[in-house]
Amino acid sequence: MLQPKRMKFRKMFKGRNRGLANGTEVSFGEFGLKAVGRGRLTARQIEAARRAMTRHIKRQGQIWIRVFPDKPITSKPLEVRMGKGKGNVEYWVCQIQPGKVLYEMNGVSEELAREAFTLAAAKLPLKTTFVTKSVM
């Protein structure tokens, strides 16, 4: 699963997921899966969607993952009293703003790409849409 190799600080503030997205265009492949809603993806969800797409296209074509989980989420163990410091890092997430391209695909037909992205979208907690590369 995806997670940073090293970080300057182990734990992070909760923060707020506001603002506009970077990476709103399809840059590497022909087709993309774009987030319509706002939320956060865990490393497990990113990997589950990737596996679903890879299995559906039967290892032909190429897939790019355009998001990376770089925010640690902590939690305290069950039945532990409040206080005594922040909990341990449990998992990693990536904060998603509307318009962010999550995955890209190349080397497959549009129909196959649509089906693969539909399977991937079922694994994600966000509303997504299918996009194609805009040629100017």
Curated annotation (Swiss-Prot):
Q: Does the keyword Acetylation apply?
A: no
Q: Which Pfam families match?
A: Ribosomal_L16 (PF00252)
Q: Which UniProt keywords apply?
A: Ribonucleoprotein, Ribosomal protein, RNA-binding, rRNA-binding, tRNA-binding
Gene Ontology MF terms: rRNA binding; structural constituent of ribosome; tRNA binding
What Gene3D superfamilies would the database entry show?
Answer: Ribosomal protein L10e/L16
Q: Name one GO biological process term.
A: translation
Q: Which InterPro entries match?
A: Ribosomal_uL16, Ribosomal_uL16_bact-type, Ribosomal_uL16_CS, Ribosomal_uL16_dom, Ribosomal_uL16_sf
Recorded GO CC terms: cytosolic large ribosomal subunit
Q: Which SUPFAM superfamilies match?
A: Ribosomal protein L16p/L10e
* UniProt keyword rRNA-binding present: yes
| Purpose | Binds 23S rRNA and is also seen to make contacts with the A and possibly P site tRNAs.
Known partners and oligomeric status: Part of the 50S ribosomal subunit.
| HAMAP family with a match to the protein in the record | Ribosomal_uL16
**Which family does the record claim for this protein?**
Belongs to the universal ribosomal protein uL16 family.
| NCBIfam families for the chain | rplP_bact
Q: What is this protein called?
A: Large ribosomal subunit protein uL16
Gene label: rplP
